[in-house]
Amino acid sequence: MSIRIGTYLIWASIADGERKDMGGKMADKKPWLVDVPVKVNIWVRPECQRKQFEVIKQARPSILFIQSDGGRNEQEWKIINEHRKMFDTEIDWDCKVYKIYADKNYGLYTMADMRNELLWSKVDRCIMLEDDQIPSVSYFRFCAELLERYKNDERICCICGMNHLGVSENVTSDYFFSRQGSIWGIAIWKRTYDQYGKFMYGNDPYVMTLLKQRTKHNRIAWKRICAYAKSKEYEGHEAGAEFFIEFAMYGLNQLQIVPKYNMISNIGCSDQAVHSNDIKMLPRGIRRVFNAKIYEVNFPLKHPEYVIPDVEYEKKRNRIMAYNHPIVFWARKVESFALMVRYGKLKHALKKAKNTILPAKES
């Protein structure tokens, strides 16, 4: 059936308990294994889409939100329709499915708005997966259990699937807490989403002073905070989960849950990626976070007794990302600039250099 969300017409099906056969075939469905909503994104990278879908089929979550923007050209439409067919015909377990299929290309941010309006009207928690994020099978149960355990604990803003170190050997539980994490494969609550989009902090000089003090060792975060306080876009992007999750740490003193063993691998660093370059144009220190090894976790989970941020993990994670490390930061900027020039991306390199060099403008 088609439904209208705001001013946009999209396609949605199998909502509110309605069930229909897949591909015209009636068959006995396997039972779901994990009672958790999952949002997946259809795009134009077949090597990513199929690999992720096979993991989802093994995990068998109870609810799927399938977001699919339209193509920008005939070739993209061909791939998108193939991926839609895969989801339409190969979901072989009992699963409530919400399909958000656009009939044209609306773009990243408009599609996110449409999805969020539907998603958060149906559920109060959700795993968020982009098409290039490959989880371990146990990741789904890991998220489901912690989403329930911490649903009313407002000290926690999200559950991360990624551990930047791969394994945190010193951690004595199956997960720990951090003020720094990753949005690659996160699970959040509606209460987390309800914190998004609030930029009133920019109107209060006192709050801005506090935020400047809190971010004195993170120039990148401070530039974003200043930029979004007065503009909808920064470096060509609207504020999204990456900004708001980080802001939750600085502005709301919230923490993120990080698994002891990494459970997410991003395999989508290519010219089809929205937020990252082709991997050959990334500094070597950043390349390590892509195509990471993933691990399965054993159950029952061993929970930490105390809610304390792991400062050593934060330091190591921030060095990988060149946060709070000016020498590493500038060395990578130079390396990135050189790689872009080498591979014929001079215009893009100059734009990135401008954004890096110009100071943050306070409101």
Can you name each region flagged by the protein language model?
Residues 24-129, 133-363:
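Peripheral/terminal regions associated with large enzymatic or DNA-binding modules
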Residues 5-6, 26:
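Generic extreme N-terminus detector
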